Amino acid sequence: MKKIIAIMLAACCLLSLAACGAKEADYKLGLGVELSTASSAENNAQVDATVAAVILDASGKIVQCRIDVAQNKMDVTGGAVDTAKTFKTKMELGSEYGMAGIIDNNGDGVMKEWNEQANAFEAYVVGKTAAEVKAIETQEANGHQIAVDEALLSAGCSMQITDFMAAVVKACEDKAAVAFKAGEGFKLGVAAISTAAESTAATADANGSANMYTDYGAAVVGADGKILAALNDATQPKIAISAAGVVEADFKATKRELGSEYGMAGIIDNNGDSVMKEWYEQSAAFSAFVVGKTAAEVAGLETQEVNAHHIAVDEDLLAAGCSMQITGLKAVVAQAANYAR
């Protein structure tokens, strides 16, 4: 009898421990983009977009952070454009980016590659709030605004961090952040996919445009490989060019930031249900739809061509109000899920 009681008590303890291990907590996923066209000059059109994804706990502190930069450049000499040009982000370039050993901003002899320095910053902001990230002190070194804190410098991040800070703060303060519950073992990924396909060359009569558009995605992936939360956004900066080079650059905000100003609502009824929502609403519907799916399942979402747009086939997604083209959305969210670490 004593043996049976002992076994039962042991079993209860194991069940209790398992229950504790499986306890879920409340989190939020936020996405932020800081974009500049300021480096465009003469025959070079350039867009620098820093994207950050953060997971916040219930107290607003960063639990995980991921950062990348889409630094897209195009030679526009003579007003020409390359619509087939492909782009890699700085994280994707890795050691190919070529920063290691170039500039010793803080004089310690340690000059790491861009991705290593970005990883150090990601780790540094864990446990901080948006206000604390915003308040990170910087100093000028070799024309760069680098950290003052020795903890960050000694971790190997001695490059300029102001765009990192801005993107992370935007992600923390994301008004469209999505809530989710999770236990242990989840990972976070961020991705950016760019195209120049809609660029136009300058002619003798009219300016052209170097349109380096980018889709951004963030995904939280559970231990089972399924998406727990996702977000996406997009930027469409337009850089006017002539035969003499860059004329002017125009960028206001991301599509999510523009909200109703983007002006998609009521324009195209792709699936004939008379529901024509704004871009940010359709984006949110897509993000909600992919929860519970794997990266492969998102990448494999079936599409159909309607009004020259590749829209969803799935009636649940269409009924949720997402009837716009989803090829860019599914590609970048799937990539973010694959990049989760």
What are these regions (language model features)?
Residues 16-19:
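C-terminal motif of bacterial Sec signal peptides marking the signal peptidase cleavage site
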Residues 1, 21-23:
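Long, contiguous C-terminal modules that act as interaction/assembly or targeting platforms
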Residues 1-11:
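Positively charged n-region of N-terminal signal peptides that target proteins for export
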